[in-house]
From Swiss-Prot:
Protein task: Transcriptional regulator.
Positions bound to Ni(2+): H79, H90, H92, C98
Cited HAMAP family: NikR
DNA-binding is among the record's keywords: yes
Cofactor note text: Binds 1 nickel ion per subunit.
Species this protein is from: Dictyoglomus thermophilum (strain ATCC 35947 / DSM 3960 / H-6-12)
Gene3D superfamilies found in the cross-reference section: ACT-like. Chain A, domain 2, Met repressor-like
Protein name: Putative nickel-responsive regulator
Keyword DNA-binding: yes
InterPro entries: Acetolactate_synth/TF_NikR_C, ACT-like_dom_sf, Arc_rbn_hlx_hlx, CopG, CopG/NikR_regulator, Ni_resp_reg_NikR, Ribbon_hlx_hlx, TF_NikR_Ni-bd_C
Cofactor: Ni(2+)
Organism phylogeny: Bacteria, Pseudomonadati, Dictyoglomota, Dictyoglomia, Dictyoglomales
SUPFAM superfamilies xrefs: ACT-like, Ribbon-helix-helix
Family, similarity comment: Belongs to the transcriptional regulatory CopG/NikR family.
Amino acid sequence: MTKIVRFGVSVEEDLLENFDKIIENKGYNSRSEAIRDLMRDYIIKEKWNIKSEKVAGSISLIYEHDVYGLSEKLTDIQHHYHDVIISTLHVHLDEKNCMEVILVRGKVEKIKKLYNEISSLKWVRHTNISITDII
């Protein structure tokens, strides 16, 4: 387990009151626990800006399965990025729409390229990416 370091933070009173309300509503046991989560989130967001950093995450997309050639194009793209794709989940949302969740792990630069390539396809209706640090 990593050593815990204590440090002090000075903030405006109203900022602290608002923060305390939020962490109470979310069920945090302490300010320290909430601040640690915020720090981790900030670090992960910053890593997303550094091409050589390694991250893990998921890319989700919704598309119409009956558009000619789209499923094949998505499969081709995924094969091209086999080194960062861990797994893929395919779900039929209704008779027309499919959702895929692609689990990824690797360098930010390559994962961004994969995400951009998928999200730029004409009949992909929505894409979203969620990343985390490999801690």
